[in-house]
């Protein structure tokens, strides 16, 4: 069980620091909720459920933890205003899925959005994921 009060405090601190550093408060930010699991199939089921809720999913990677155990990690991604209420609502929606899958929620992150940038770093359409990535996910075999 995750402590939503502590998560909200962390969220508020992250947002405050980004805004103090000058990140654009009006920009949409890519929010990446970091997930880890020792079982790829269970992680895959979790991210399919998150995808059905409207989130994008980054490609899973295999890593080793400090003890040499294999973990599979990925991000559940959205693009929203940098707003604590929105991010907390996402956590409240995702944490039951994460707990059900016995996965680990490792917090969330985002990128600095320069208010003076002339061009979107994600290209002309401003999309974090391109249509090919989405098509690849939709065509992936689900176990």
UniProtKB/Swiss-Prot annotation:
Residues 115-136 have a biased composition (Acidic residues). It is found in: Cytoplasm. This is Regulator of ribonuclease activity B. Keywords: Cytoplasm. InterPro entries: RraB, RraB-like_sf, RraB_dom. Residues 113-143 are annotated as: Disordered. The lineage of its organism: Bacteria, Pseudomonadati, Pseudomonadota, Gammaproteobacteria, Pasteurellales. SUPFAM superfamilies: Hypothetical protein VC0424 (SSF89946).
């Amino acid at each position: 069980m995750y402590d939503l009060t502590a998560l909200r405090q962390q969220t508020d601190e992250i947002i405050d620091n980004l805004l103090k550093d000058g990140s654009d408060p009006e920009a949409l930010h890519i929010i990446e909720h970091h997930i880890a699991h020792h079982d790829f199939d269970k992680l895959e089921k979790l991210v399919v459920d998150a995808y059905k809720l409207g989130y994008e999913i980054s490609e899973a990677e295999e890593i080793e933890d400090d003890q040499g155990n294999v973990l599979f990690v990925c991000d559940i991604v959205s693009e929203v205003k940098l707003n604590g209420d929105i991010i907390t609502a996402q956590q409240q929606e995702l944490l039951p899925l994460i707990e059900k899958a016995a996965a680990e929620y490792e917090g969330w992150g985002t990128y600095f959005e320069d208010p003076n940038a002339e061009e979107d770093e994600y290209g002309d359409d401003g999309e974090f994921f391109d249509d090919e990535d989405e098509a690849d996910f939709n065509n992936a075999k689900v176990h």
